[in-house]
Amino acid sequence: MRRNSSTGIFLGLILLGTAGAVTESALAEAPADFLKTFEAEARQDKDFTGFSAERGRAFFQQTHGSDWSCASCHTKNPAVAGKHAKTSKPIKPLAPSANPERFTSTRKVDKWFRRNCNDVVGRTCTPQEKGDILTYLMSVK
């Protein structure tokens, strides 16, 4: 039986596209993946004893050096939408339970922790702080 070469090429492209989609979805991350990363980093400190949702909540709601808190933009309930304190730009809910797209991309997680910690706290957040915040956000229903 003779096959048409264009059919073979077409089937090959479909298989490549499917493999790409599988690879992409296999690379999708979850909040728990970031917790593992933060924990590995935090364990470099011999005093690390684990993350705390309560410490994360306190940090999230505490006003820091620039008179802002995380809650200034993300609200005291991170399961609801917020808005930027200066620009009033809408911000989707931060809690993964309310917004499943949160904490699924290393690029975005790194970008937003870097930017927001510098803006709100005036410095880079520690792995302990990041883990506490994420533990808190994962506990919000």
Task: Briefly describe each language-model feature range.
Residues G82-K89:
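Short cysteine/histidine-rich zinc-coordinating motifs and their immediately flanking basic loops
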Residues S66-P78, I133:
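The canonical Cys-X-X-Cys-His
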Residues H64, P78, M138-K141:
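Short alpha-helix boundary/capping elements
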Residues P90-A95:
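Short glycine/proline- and charge-enriched loop/turn segments
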Residues R57-D67:
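Local sequence-structure signature of Cys/Sec-based thiol-disulfide redox active-site neighborhoods
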Residues M1-A53, S97-K141:
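Post-cleavage N-terminal segment of exported redox proteins
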